[in-house]
């Protein structure tokens, strides 16, 4: 019994240690890159917060509790914007068996996050991947529809020059500027705007934890 307990403790420490290493590895984006790689012009950010969907977030995001829980944090913020009851990471994850250590050890795939979402809402949840650039543009145009919510899975490396995969809600689309408003749930980044084509390129990549491409979650 003692040996089994010891093995269990060692395994748990190993999992948490692995999670810590993963988080450190994904935090290699410099403060300068965080600021300069995307658009943060106050006037444009202010306009973006006034978009129909972004406005439902009330310019207030609950930041992810650690570097591995961007998916649950994105769901919690999105659910709050549409009036669902589960509006914290803990409530989103309760009963799902996911991230039970407090960390999502290797992160969640879009399919896994969709399963978590569907377990907590009566709304339809879809995973959209293998989109063409034109299809992505059409979805971004619909990202201002109050009846729809998008969560995007992308790699930071394409946009910021370093970093790993990440989830964040889409706050909307400034069509005249052809820019997407990303409600980044990581407090180091905070919400930002980026050219649609660059965001598509960051999404149109293969998830390192599987053999499928990243994509969008659509909740409607």
Task: Locate each region found by the language model.
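Conserved active-site-adjacent core of cysteine acyl-enzyme catalytic domains
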Residues: 25-37, 52-54, 94-219
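Positively charged n-region of N-terminal signal peptides that target proteins for export
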Residues: 1-4
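Active-site-adjacent structural segments surrounding the nucleophilic cysteine of cysteine proteases
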Residues: 6-8, 14-106
């Amino acid at each position: 019994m003692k040996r089994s307990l010891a093995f269990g403790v060692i395994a748990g420490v190993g999992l948490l240690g692995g999670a810590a290493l993963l988080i450190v590895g994904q935090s290699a984006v410099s403060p300068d890159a965080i600021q300069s790689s995307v658009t943060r012009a106050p006037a444009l950010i202010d306009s973006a917060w006034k978009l129909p969907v972004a406005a439902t977030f009330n310019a207030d995001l609950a930041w992810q509790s650690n570097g591995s829980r961007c998916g649950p944090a994105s769901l919690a913020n999105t659910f709050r914007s549409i009036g669902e009851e589960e509006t914290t990471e803990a409530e989103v994850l309760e009963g799902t068996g996911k991230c039970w250590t407090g960390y999502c050890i290797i992160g969640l795939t879009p399919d896994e996050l969709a399963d978590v979402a569907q377990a907590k809402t009566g709304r339809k949840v879809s995973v959209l991947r293998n989109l063409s650039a034109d299809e992505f543009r059409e979805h971004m145009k619909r990202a201002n529809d109050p009846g729809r919510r998008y969560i995007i899975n992308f790699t930071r490396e394409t946009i910021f020059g370093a970093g790993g995969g990440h989830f964040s809600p889409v706050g909307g689309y400034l069509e005249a500027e052809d820019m997407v408003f990303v409600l980044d749930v990581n407090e180091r980044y905070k919400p930002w705007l980026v050219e649609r084509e660059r965001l598509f390129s960051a999404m149109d990549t293969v998830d390192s934890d599987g053999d499928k491409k990243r994509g969008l979650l659509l909740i409607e």
